[in-house]
Amino acid sequence: MKKTLMASAVGAVIAFGTHGAMAAAPADWSSVAATDVTLFYPGVSPVEWITKGTEHGGARALKKGETCAGCHSEEASDMGEKMASGKKLEPSPIAGKAPFINAKVQAANDGENLYLRFTWKQPAASGAAPMDADNPVKIAYMLEGGSKVELAEAGGCWGSCHGDARTMPGAADTKTKYVKDGSLANGVYYDLNQWRSGENKAFDGYVATERVMEGGQALVDAQGKLDGDTWTVVFTRKFAGGEGDVTLAPGNLYNFGFAIHDDSATGRYHHVSLGYSLGIDAQGDITAAKQ
């Protein structure tokens, strides 16, 4: 993937956030390398569709150890166009829905905390009725250690996307995201952090047998702002936490993916990244070097 340097954001017009007292993100993000990531509208493309192989030819490549990003990173925007328009894998297209979002991701650490900074331009609103009127924007990322979750290494957070989860066609509204054979005790889970714009709140949870949006102890801080048409959200997360928190350590790589719920979206109507590796003082697709 292409990497660039990102100028630091200035002049917040709208600011939201929760504020941690101990950790401090880099004062000058312009010195931290940024990774360009295209998030795309995924339509109805659950893990079952990806791995079955009858409609998705990439299932064979996955069995050989290839990653989703290895095949699709350069065509993510095209995939989003096809699905947002209803040409493929979307039985109920939303007129005006943005097909993709280009984001930049920066990462750093101070030996005790991980800092993740996401920036992207606000797409034009679709004009559709809001699904979550209280939160125009939400952003979440997932971490996984050990590649115990199905598809975590190859597809990032796609291992939590199932065809019977809520907002999928015909699914019950009570069924949340989950992972196959999910178990905190056995390390089969995603660590989940989310920030919501309208509520001015951050959530620290996990996805195992179900999605739980509380109970984590690693998330210290999440701050977001809208400067003109550009969003900036910074997460501060301790290396170690508690149950449901992936423990981070220098020299290691972790499976990583993130999603943006734009335009007051909920459930599957988000924009998602493919799967990437996050390195803590180790070379990954995204590298969090000590500052």
UniProtKB/Swiss-Prot annotation:
Alphabetized SMART domains for the sequence: EB_dh
Ranges that cross the membrane: none
Positions bound to heme c 1: 68, 71-72
Gene induction: By anaerobic conditions.
Top-level taxon of the source organism: Bacteria
Coiled coil: none
Cellular localisation: Periplasm
Segment forming the signal sequence: 1-23
One MF term in the entry's GO annotations: heme binding
Pfam family of the protein (one): EB_dh
Protein name, per record: Cytochrome c-552
Taxonomic source organism: Stutzerimonas stutzeri (Pseudomonas stutzeri)
Gene name for this UniProt entry: nirB
